[in-house]
């Protein structure tokens, strides 16, 4: 490619053309300004000129005998004065309109420039915000944990910046302790239910009790109140006679295999708890049997003084 070279003469001629164009524009604007100022001056002096012309025609009309010529000259002067005034007013209004348009164009241009600058500032702000977000997103470390380990109620941003702590993991011994506690709580309840079932009399026993009440007073005297030893033996028999329901041996082995290992200390604690529960149950059975015997003796015995068994039972009580 050939380099384009410009001579000094061409550069100087270009500058001269630019200067001539600028000077011509300045001269035209100056001429228009002068014309506008002259027209404004003429409008200002038009009132005084019209008043002086009216006085002159009035005096000339009175003194001159040729009134027709005076009237024609007056008409011509008034027409010329009106035309000149209209011309001046039109020129002034045109110049004023041009000035207003120029100023309005300048105002619109400035508004457009201001709006363009505001738009550029807005775009720059958006780009800065986007760049900051991209940098922050690069700094944020996403959590590497599974969703189920995220704690509920925590903020998403905090969980994204700081890794969520793992939930506490319990050992096998802790889980076995919990299982053993649940079993120890469930066993006394089941035994109490069996004790209550053994304690509640069957319908056949109730029938025998009603028959004994219907017997004669002599037989009632021979009948003795049941002792606590018999009740305890009966409860033992009912416990021993309660068969375990037949179950599948494979299912039993599966449940045994699933059970966690238990510490021997837990066996000791459970045995002590069972022993204390059993002693409390015996005491409750004794007190209940004594109360029942006393109530039966009160209901079945009519003669209090001649009843030796009642006095002996009261002595025992």
Swiss-Prot record:
Q: Where is this region: Disordered?
A: 162-296
Q: InterPro entries of this UniProt entry? A: ABI
Any one of the GO CC terms: cytoskeleton
Q: What are the Polar residues biased-composition ranges?
A: 182-195, 226-235
Mark out the compositionally biased spans (Low complexity).
196-206
> Compositional bias (Basic and acidic residues) at which positions?
278-288
Q: Where is the composition biased (Basic residues)?
A: 171-181, 207-223
- Family, similarity comment: Belongs to the ABI family.
Q: What is the purpose of this protein?
A: Involved in regulation of actin and microtubule organization. Part of a WAVE complex that activates the Arp2/3 complex.
Whom does it interact with, and what assembly results?
Binds SCAR.
Q: What is this protein called?
A: Probable protein ABIL3
User: What is the scientific name of the source organism?
Assistant: Oryza sativa subsp. japonica (Rice)
